Amino acid sequence: MRWTTALLSLAASTLVAAQGTPVERPRPVQTYSGVVIYQPPVNYTEPRTLYARTLEIKEKGKNVLLATWENYLPNNNPNPYYPVYESFDNGKSWKERSRLYDQVNGWGARYQPFIYQLPGNLGRFRKGDILIAGNFIPQDLSQTKIDIYVSKDGARTWKFVSSVARGGEAIPNNGLTPVWEPFLYLYKNELICYYSDQRDFVNNGQKMVHQTSTDLLNWGPLRNDVAYNNTEWRPGMPIVSKLPNGKFLLTYEFFGSVEGGFSVYTRLADDPRNFNEAPGTVLRATDGTVPRGSPYNVWTPVGGPNGTVIVSSGDAPEIFLNRGLAEPGTAWEKVSIPSNTSYTRSLNILKSDPRALLVVGGGLLPGQPGVENNRVDATLWEVPSAPKKRAAAFEA
C-alpha cells in the first residue's frame, strides 16, 4: 500500500537524523478549505443539500475522488436523484459524473446515500464495482426502503441490484417504523449493510442492526448491533472502521445517554457482526467536550505507533483524535480544522498520502440557522504526526 511506502520513507529520514545528518522532511500536504463541490441554485428546496459521502477510486492509474449527497430539487421535486461528482486533483475542483435515479419504486433517491467500492469479489459482482446504498422514499414520506445499486463503469451508469429493508413513514419519531442511514462493509466474503431501525417499536425507540449478503442479491436475517431495549432511546448513524490491531470501531449517536442529547459513543469488537456484545463508551475529549450527533470515523497510520482514529460530529467544526486505538480510557484530543459545521460530515484518508484527511459536508439540518445557505464543500487537512515529545528522542 502507498501509505506503507510513505511511512518507510519517514522512518528512513528519522534514522538519518539520529546519525547527525540533515533530515529531509516529507513535503507538506497541499491543504485547502471551503472548496465548493456543489452550489445549489437559489430555488432549491430547503435544506438544499445534506448528508455528503465520498469515495476514492483508482482509474487509469490515477486517484479519483467521488462525492454524493442528498439533493433537494426545486418545488420538492417528486423524483430526486443522487448526484455523483468527480475530482481528479485531490478535491480542488469538481464536476458532475452521473446521476442515480430511482429505477424500481417510482419514489425518488431521496435520503442518506452511501457510496462504496467492493474491495473483493462478491457473487457475480467484481472487485472494483461501485455500490450506492440509499434510502428511497416517496414524496409524501410514507415509506422508507434501503436499496442497493451497482456501477460497473466507474460510477458513470447505475443499475438496481437488491433491496435490503423496508420501513414505514420517514419521520424520526418513536412509535413509527422507518429505516435509516445504510452503511456498507465487506467482511469475510459477506457484505454487511448496517442501518438504523425503528420497526421494533415495542422494545426500542430505535436500534442499530445489520443484514449480510454473500451475493448482493439475497439478504440474511436481521441482527442487532446496538439495541438497548428502551422505547425512548435512539442509537443511530452507524459507521465502522477496521483498526490495525484487528479490531473494528463503531461510532454512533445515542439519544438516551446519561450525557444528554445525541452524545457520540464508540464500541470495539473483534468481529464487525458482534457489536451488540460490546460495551458502549462515550467519547469525551481531554477538555471535557462530548461531541453530539451524526458522527463519522476513519483511521490513518499517521500519528504514532497505533496511528490515529479521527471522529467528526454534527454539532461543531472540530474533530477528535485518538492515538490509542479508541480503547476505553485513552485520550481524545479536540482539534480545530478549517471546516464548517455540517450534519454527518464524511471523512476520508487519501490513498496517495495517509496524512491527508478529506472532510466533506452537505450543510445543516432544517431549522438550524444558516440552513438556507447549505452547499456541499470540501476541506483537506493534514493529520498531525506523532507528538513531539515522542519524536524528540529520535531527533537528538
Regions found by a protein language model. Give the residues of each.
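Fungal secretory targeting signals
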Residues: 1-22, 395-396
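Long, low-complexity intrinsically disordered regions
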Residues: 12-15, 175-178, 192
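Beta-rich carbohydrate-recognition and catalytic domains
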Residues: 19-50, 55-109, 118-174, 186-231, ...
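Conserved beta-strand position repeated once per blade in WD40 beta-propeller domains
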Residues: 51-53, 112-114, 181-183, 237-239, ...
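Transmembrane beta-barrel architecture of outer membranes
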Residues: 179, 208, 235-237
